[in-house]
């Protein structure tokens, strides 16, 4: 194991995203714990998404809230063959990604790729919002999202 001094970082967790089969039931459960999801929005195929080099639909419902300083995002796929639909079918749901904020996206992609991460998906919502997803072989099952803009 390599022993290195921790470097100062400007990275912060923006949110942790969960793919769920029933967003309404999940919101109801979280509400019973005092966790309020304040924004729910439907997305449709008009969003340009590249997933493993192929253009795919991004049909889903997303709800956002907070648990203290950490944002929570719930995602329910509503279309067949979307990245979230594939994840739900493979895993039954669960943590999909950790979103990092406060970054220069291009610089962060270069830094993460230099460290072994691989971009596997990009989504654009208009001109102002871009989400880039990266996998890291040394942390199987963990996906990082770099998000530019907010919806």
Protein language model regions, located:
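A generic structured-segment signal
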Residues: 30, 71-76, 84-88
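Short loop/beta submotifs within extracellular cysteine-rich repeat domains
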Residues: 38, 82-83, 139-144
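Long, hydrophobic N-terminal alpha-helical segment
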Residues: 1-51
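Vicinal oxygen chelate
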Residues: 1-7, 13-21, 63-76, 87-104, ...
């Amino acid at each position: 194991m390599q022993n290195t001094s921790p470097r100062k970082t400007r990275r912060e967790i923006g949110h942790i995203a969960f793919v769920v089969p029933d967003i309404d039931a999940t919101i109801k459960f979280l509400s019973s714990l005092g966790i309020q999801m304040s924004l729910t929005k439907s997305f449709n195929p008009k969003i340009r998404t590249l997933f493993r080099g192929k253009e795919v639909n991004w049909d889903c419902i997303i709800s956002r809230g907070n648990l203290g300083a950490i944002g929570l995002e719930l995602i329910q796929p509503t279309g067949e063959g979307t990245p979230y639909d594939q994840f739900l079918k493979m895993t039954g749901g669960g943590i999909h990604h950790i979103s990092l904020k406060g970054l220069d996206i291009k610089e962060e992609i270069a830094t993460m790729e230099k460290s072994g991460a691989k971009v596997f998906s990009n989504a654009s919502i208009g001109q102002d919002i871009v989400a880039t997803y990266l996998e890291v072989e040394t942390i199987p099952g963990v996906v990082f999202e770099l998000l530019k803009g907010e919806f």
